[in-house]
Amino acid sequence: MARITVEDCLKQIPNRFELALAATYRARQLAQGHTPKIESRDKPTVVALREIAAGQVGLEMLKKVPV
């Protein structure tokens, strides 16, 4: 599979700080057993970035964070 780059993800979430937060939150969800939205055998962090680059996951991840 092709490598994922930050530039691919920045097309979906232009702010790199928000991108890092969204990817971190999604990777934690995947590590805890949530179902991935794309087919991949990669680690949760890579799957999270692939989902963001594909437009499957976005800034809505930050709105789901419990306070």
From Swiss-Prot:
Classification via Pfam families: RNA_pol_Rpb6 (PF01192)
GO BP term (any one): DNA-templated transcription
Entry GO MF terms: DNA binding; DNA-directed RNA polymerase activity
Catalytic activity: RNA(n) + a ribonucleoside 5'-triphosphate = RNA(n+1) + diphosphate
Protein EC: 2.7.7.6
Keywords: DNA-directed RNA polymerase, Nucleotidyltransferase, Transcription, Transferase
Gene Ontology CC terms: DNA-directed RNA polymerase complex
Protein family according to the UniProt entry: Belongs to the RNA polymerase subunit omega family.
Subunit and partners: The RNAP catalytic core consists of 2 alpha, 1 beta, 1 beta' and 1 omega subunit. When a sigma factor is associated with the core the holoenzyme is formed, which can initiate transcription.
Function: Promotes RNA polymerase assembly. Latches the N- and C-terminal regions of the beta' subunit thereby facilitating its interaction with the beta and alpha subunits.
Protein name: DNA-directed RNA polymerase subunit omega
Annotated source species: Burkholderia multivorans (strain ATCC 17616 / 249)
Organism ancestry: Bacteria, Pseudomonadati, Pseudomonadota, Betaproteobacteria, Burkholderiales
Gene from which this protein is expressed: rpoZ
